[in-house]
């Protein structure tokens, strides 16, 4: 393998912003993202041409190589010449499987263009649509590569049919662009095959665009003939139409440079004061301005420690310089600066605005951190939080086979969470078990494999269980919560938040850290809130619950405001029914009595008082359990629709839509996550292995009333609690 053949050129080009492109590759699982990456690496001199297409170079973990799938988002900086001019292509290869989509979504924040890879036979699938939707919401411009033309030729053969199939895929992608892109980009970003969207075979390393077809005098019938003549003919096609030429030429031509992209992306992804000095530097991607960087990825290097990777929006990241972490609110000194080449980091003295860089020694940085020059320490608003589409709803209890390795396990779990925040680690206070939650069973399996491969830990894991949510369906009366010393009282009611409010929060339109007047205006106009209540929001938590302060003139309340908010957050983490997280509840503080002496109003007094009042209201407001629901997108021959319908019904699911396509059908359905563990085997069995499908998290839905109390009892028993939920009297003040 030839490593870093052009690193010196790369470091030169990164100073010229017009010659930089930041791109990602997104697709449904197994549509060929990493195979495409290999070919691009090969062309850049970073991978032997002989093994490109098979190496999976950006899949650098053992588990990725073994499973032939991408688990992490991997970076590489590539050198490419277009019309005699050198360009730096900062490339991120991302996972396609639904269980790892948080990594893809984080990558979309720091790129300006996305190569959307679509399997020519399978077409646009669930994850294709989901990632394209998020990309468009982030104002990331899509370009298209229709892959696996070799497979399409074997199935269709006719050049005319192949062309019709390609046109249909372009139409499907354009429909999504017209649906999800902001109005100002809907027409400009529509794909036009005549202008250069690419098609080809990543495995066989050839690619073409219509302009290249015309330029090289290649006909569709010529391509079909190649696959009847054998390997030598395919090798000739590789030489005549190299894949990297079609793809990277398309990228240079249609993906904007960082400066042009930041001018329209900054107002979308950064919601601070647009009159702030930093804005003009970010809009121009000015390398001479103060540093502003967004961290999108954290890796734990066994030798170097924590490595924070992100996009520099303004200024220059230099080794040895002190910077400020806005979310963590701490200064840190950058030890080293480097750019990524797959699993390798190449050191640099400095990296300028518009580029993707890795920094060593930012030990307090986490994914989503905003890193700025020290001069912005007190004035910088962090970048908007990323909106995650999935939720971590599958949990296993784990313990080391060797009890002496418990400390090592705790450290390893902490590091896995740093790298992947959607892996959530908790300790069951009742049983002392370590609980690991992930998006799905594969997510958990990969985490357990990493514990073994990276940290040498053999662990025992329980069967997977589902994480539920608790909520209320009615408003409660006001209840009193009294502190243990009887000196502090809180008068609280609870109510369900309406669907529009939940939508605004889940889409990141309403957040805790935003201008209160702007938030109140949105709640009034779009969610029907009372004007007074809309102005008085104290806190919003991660599970879409709100705390509203409707008190007037309560002495000393301001002094304990943070403690009250913390008490609210703790109560929302474990509800009264089954100690599951609470979702979609409005907690209203109507009145309070607060002791004048700080010694009598500490957290030990305030937390239980707030919790008891909330839980008393909760139990009288028609409480219920919400279960996570999956959306299934199934492509199947027509004759299997009845069989699929039967499986969905058995799984407590429902058919949402059945669409007839050219030679098959598309079935959209929903099933509870709790019923999904064997769905793959069942669908394969009833369709003779001829169906293909994808899945994604859809929504939270109340469990059927007939199952509610039995489910509550099972959850509580599993957690080592009494089977019966607490009674109202348990939370009433004596």
From Swiss-Prot:
It comes from Desulfurococcus mucosus (Desulfurococcus mobilis). The modification Diphthamide is found at residue 600. This is Elongation factor 2. CDD domains: aeEF2_snRNP_like_IV, EF2, EF2_II, Elongation_Factor_C. GTP binds at residues 27-34, 93-97, 147-150. It is found in: Cytoplasm. One of its GO terms (molecular function) is translation elongation factor activity. Gene3D superfamilies: 3.30.230.10, 3.30.70.240, Elongation Factor G (Translational Gtpase), domain 3, P-loop containing nucleotide triphosphate hydrolases, Translation factors. Keywords: Cytoplasm, Elongation factor, GTP-binding, Nucleotide-binding, Protein biosynthesis. The gene is fusA.
């Amino acid at each position: 393998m030839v490593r870093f053949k052009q690193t010196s050129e790369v470091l030169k080009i990164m100073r010229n912003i017009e010659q930089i492109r930041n791109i990602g590759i997104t697709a449904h699982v197994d549509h060929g993202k990493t195979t495409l990456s290999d070919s691009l690496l090969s062309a850049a001199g970073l991978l032997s041409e002989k093994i490109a297409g098979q190496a999976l170079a950006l899949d650098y973990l053992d588990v990725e190589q073994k499973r032939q799938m991408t688990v992490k988002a991997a970076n590489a900086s590539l050198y490419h010449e277009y019309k005699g001019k050198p360009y730096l292509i900062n490339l991120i290869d991302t996972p396609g499987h639904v269980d790892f989509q948080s990594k893809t979504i984080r990558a979309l924040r720091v790129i300006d263009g996305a190569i959307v890879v679509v399997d020519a036979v399978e077409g646009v699938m669930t994850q294709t649509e989901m990632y394209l939707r998020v990309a468009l919401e982030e104002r990331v411009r899509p370009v298209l590569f229709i892959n696996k033309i070799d497979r399409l030729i074997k199935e269709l053969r006719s050049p005319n049919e192949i062309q019709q199939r390609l046109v249909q895929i372009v139409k499907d992608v354009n429909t999504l662009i017209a649906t999800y892109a902001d109005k100002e980009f809907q027409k400009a970003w529509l794909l036009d095959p005549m202008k250069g969207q690419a098609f080809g075979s990543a495995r066989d390393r050839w690619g073409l665009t219509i302009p290249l077809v015309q330029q090289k005098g290649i006909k569709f019938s010529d391509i079909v003939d190649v696959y009847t003549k054998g390997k030598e003919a395919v090798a000739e096609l590789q030489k005549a139409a190299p894949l990297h030429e079609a793809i990277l030429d398309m990228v240079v031509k249609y993906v904007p440079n960082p400066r042009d992209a930041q001018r329209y992306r900054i107002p979308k992804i950064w919601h601070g004061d647009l009159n702030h000095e930093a804005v003009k530097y970010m809009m121009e991607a000015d390398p001479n301005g103060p540093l502003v960087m967004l961290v999108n990825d954290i890796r734990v290097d066994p030798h170097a420690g924590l490595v924070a990777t992100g996009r520099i929006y303004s200024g220059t990241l230099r080794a040895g310089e002190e910077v400020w972490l806005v979310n963590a609110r701490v200064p840190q000194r950058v030890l080293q600066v480097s750019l990524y080449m797959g699993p390798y980091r190449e050191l640099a003295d400095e990296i300028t605005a518009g580029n993707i860089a890795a920094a060593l020694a930012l030990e307090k940085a986490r994914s989503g951190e905003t890193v700025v020059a020290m001069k912005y320490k007190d004035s910088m608003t962090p970048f908007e939080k990323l909106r995650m589409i999935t939720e971590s709803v599958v949990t296993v209890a784990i313990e080391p086979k060797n009890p002496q390795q418990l400390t090592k396990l705790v450290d390893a779990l902490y590091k896995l969470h740093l790298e992947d925040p959607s892996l959530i680690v908790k300790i069951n206070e009742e049983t002392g078990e370590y609980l690991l939650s992930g998006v799905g069973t594969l997510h958990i399996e990969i985490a357990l494999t990493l514990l073994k491969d990276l940290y040498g830990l053999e662990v025992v894991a329980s069967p997977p269980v589902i994480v539920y949510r608790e909520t209320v369906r009615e408003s409660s009366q006001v209840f009193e919560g009294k502190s243990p010393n009887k000196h502090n009282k809180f008068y609280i009611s609870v109510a369900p938040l309406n669907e529009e409010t939940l939508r605004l929060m889940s889409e990141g339109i309403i957040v805790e850290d935003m201008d209160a007047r702007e938030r109140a205006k949105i709640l009034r106009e779009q969610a029907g809130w009372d004007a007074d209540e809309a102005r008085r929001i104290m806190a919003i938590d991660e599970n879409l619950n709100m705390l509203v302060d409707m008190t007037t003139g309560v002495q000393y309340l301001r002094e304990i405001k943070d403690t009250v908010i913390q008490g609210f957050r703790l109560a929302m983490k474990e509800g009264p029914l089954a100690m599951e997280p609470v979702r979609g509840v409005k907690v209203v503080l109507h009145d309070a009595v607060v002791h004048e002496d700080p010694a009598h109003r500490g957290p030990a007094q305030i937390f239980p008082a707030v919790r008891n009042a909330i839980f008393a209201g909760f139990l009288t407001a028609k409480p219920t359990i919400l279960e996570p629901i999956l959306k299934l997108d199934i492509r199947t021959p027509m004759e299997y629709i009845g069989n699929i319908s039967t499986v969905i019904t058995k799984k407590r699911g429902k058919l949402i839509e059945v669409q007839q396509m050219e030679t098959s059908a598309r079935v959209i359905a929903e099933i509870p996550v709790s019923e999904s563990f064997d769905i793959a085997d069942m669908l394969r069995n009833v369709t003779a292995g001829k169906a293909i499908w994808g899945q994604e998290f859809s929504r939270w839905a109340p469990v059927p009333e007939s199952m509610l109390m039995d489910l509550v009892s099972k959850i509580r028993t599993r957690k080592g609690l009494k089977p019966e939920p607490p009674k109202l009297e348990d939370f009433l003040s004596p």
